[in-house]
Amino acid sequence: MERTERGRLDHLLGRDIVHQGAALLADPLPQPSLQSVLEKPGPIVILDQVSDPRNVGAIMRSAAAFGAVAVIAQDRNAPEETGALAKAASGALETLPLLRAVNIARTIIALKAANVWCIGLDAGGKPLSGPAFADRRVALVLGAEGEGLRRLTRETCDEVAGLSMKGAMESLNVSAAAAIALYELSRL
């Protein structure tokens, strides 16, 4: 352990990083294989170019809370495991695997081959109903902030579902939508 001034941490980590006066240098967490994830029961969350580390962290926290076994993000166009992501995840980064995939559509195809029902979440989809998936292993696929699911990702999913919204908003932040969808899927 080394003690240093707060200003030095600001300089080392960047002024926009909330470090609360502490920093740790650690090895990366091990990444399990997709096969080992498939051996565990529970939903899987797939992120299609979700780029804000705070959204990814919040999604991981919700995924851990509602029994997901892993979150899969693309190896590019997705944030690294930074302090901001870890802070938003509130411990989920240490308990829930974050896998990296080269190609999201191919990952969905591999999951479908393993009898995982892949549901893309989109504002224009039919209403999501957790009880309708009671007898299926499910992967919830979430699109990027603003753009949503990419065309190939959407076409590769088994179905596209949405959240029933009665208010004045047309859509939700991806992390809020993920939490609601994961809750709905957990009501089995």
Named regions from a protein language model:
Residues M1-L188:
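Post-transcriptional modification and biogenesis factors for structured RNAs
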